[in-house]
Amino acid sequence: MNQAIADRGKVVTAAATGINLALGVLYSWSIFKDAIAQSVKEGAPGGFTWNLSSLNDPYAVACLCFAFGMIPAGKLQDARGPRITAMAGGLLVGAGMVMISMTTSYTGWLIGFGLLVGTGIAFGYSAATPAAIKWFPNNKTGLIAGIVVA
């Protein structure tokens, strides 16, 4: 293998690992949920007024959007490449996080965290692993996939 290609593969793998690290925001839901539940229980003006039984709904919507969003994200990654797909994912996750930072409404969190963040994560994941794997021979793809998603 050419040294320039090997170096490029390492850079892409490091970038893909960084993307996946950032996409771990999905798994921070329990922190958000605890803060929302505390706000509901305190009943402070301007705080969250959700029904406690619906606290997991934004996470569930995010997981569904993540799963089903992989289909168009994969098609975009195949057609336009990982840069465009990763950028779309980053913009969606960023927009969702900005949106939820400015609202306490249940619908706002369903759209912001559920739809935007969930779909953005799908686009990010679909860009990262395939891009890294393409730079290595077939006998290394399992190792590289493991490094990227670890």
Label every model-predicted segment.
Residues 36, 114, 123-137, 144:
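Intracellular juxtamembrane helix-capping segments at the cytosolic ends
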Residues 6-28:
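Pair of pore-lining "gating" transmembrane helices in MFS-fold secondary transporters
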Residues 68-107:
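Conserved MFS/SLC helix-loop-helix module at the cytosolic interface between two early adjacent transmembrane helices
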Residues 96, 107-123:
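Hydrophobic core of transmembrane alpha-helices in multi-pass small-molecule transporters
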Residues 52-53, 138-148:
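Loop-to-transmembrane helix entry/capping segments in MFS-fold secondary transporters
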Residues 113, 147-150:
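Hydrophobic alpha-helical segments of secondary membrane carriers
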Residues 34, 71-75, 130:
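Small-residue-mediated transmembrane helix hinge/kink sites in multi-pass secondary transporters
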Residues 31-68:
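Extracellular/periplasmic helix-loop-helix junction of adjacent transmembrane segments
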